[in-house]
Amino acid sequence: MTNGDVLAAVDKLKQFNQEFEFIHVVGESTLPLWLALSEAQKELSAIYHKPAFVLLEAVFPTEDSDGSGGIYDWAAQMETDRKKIANTDIQVCAAWGRIVRLDGRTQIANLAGLVSGRYAKAPVQESIGKTRPDAGYGFSGARLTELLPAGYNNSVIELLDVAGYLTFREYDGLSD
């Protein structure tokens, strides 16, 4: 799917007659799409009176063939990119994990899909970041077996979090 395809789909929401609150664009995306969707979201809200927030999935960090461009370079570039978006209704998920599907298969996936489910479950005034077990927003180790990629540690997570990305983290002492 191209950026143009995504923007054409969002453009159809101008005439969509049902209520909606958020748009989740599934699949890796980069700054050009984030910027275009930021403008489209502002137009939907201001002109068409359809406020919504947009959830996107960042590109999985990989090393270049020469071994350069590791996770810290990727995180620094992500921080730079986020500064170019002046829209609090655009959220980019920069977290991946190995998840166990309902049929028992494991898959490496961006965790925005899990977040979408938590948003649907949560009352509007409640944060999905609650960590109390009775809050019901955590993910069990049986469902989310590990955070990825390798090297996705607290320093990288903190950099991305401060920059405004949606991140996941594990807390020492907090178990299933």
Stretch-by-stretch model annotation:
Residues T2-D176:
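A glycine- and small-residue-enriched flexible loop/hinge signal that marks low-structured segments
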